[in-house]
Amino acid sequence: SLVQFETLIMKIAKRSGVWFYGSYGCFCGSGGQGRPQDASDRCCFVHDCCYGKVTDCDPKTDIYTYSEENGVVVCGGDDPCKKQICECDRVAAVCFRDNKDTYDNKYWFFPANNCQEESEPC
């Protein structure tokens, strides 16, 4: 679920997903079009693509199971669809963490009209 995604971002990237990525670049936040503007925006592009491959459950609302083992988030549970959502969220949170140093405030609340280029395929 989106609430769990926020929790994973806080755990892994040590920052608020809603605040930092709720409206960033062309892909972070609701919707997405154009080309990713930087590495953090690309994290969101890949996350959108990952959610797009989920067919048997709802990534935005379905609750998944995960645990922490030696500080590492491990997705679990018996439902393969929910596990897939968890993996999408976990990979994105790791991506945000790994690209914090190139996060650029100029892409915060980036106008959608700057995202008119043709999108690359997932």
Curated annotation (Swiss-Prot):
GO cellular component terms, semicolon-separated: extracellular region
Reactions this protein catalyses: a 1,2-diacyl-sn-glycero-3-phosphocholine + H2O = a 1-acyl-sn-glycero-3-phosphocholine + a fatty acid + H(+)
Details of cofactor binding: Binds 1 Ca(2+) ion.
Organism of origin: Bothrops pictus
Subcellular location: Secreted
GO molecular function: calcium ion binding; calcium-dependent phospholipase A2 activity; phospholipid binding
Name of the protein described by the UniProt record: Acidic phospholipase A2
UniProt-listed Gene3D superfamilies: Phospholipase A2 domain (1.20.90.10)
Role according to the record: PLA2 catalyzes the calcium-dependent hydrolysis of the 2-acyl groups in 3-sn-phosphoglycerides.
Keywords carried by this UniProt record: Calcium, Disulfide bond, Hydrolase, Lipid degradation, Lipid metabolism, Metal-binding, Secreted
The protein's Enzyme Commission number: 3.1.1.4
Family annotation (PANTHER family): PHOSPHOLIPASE A2 FAMILY MEMBER, PHOSPHOLIPASE A2, MEMBRANE ASSOCIATED
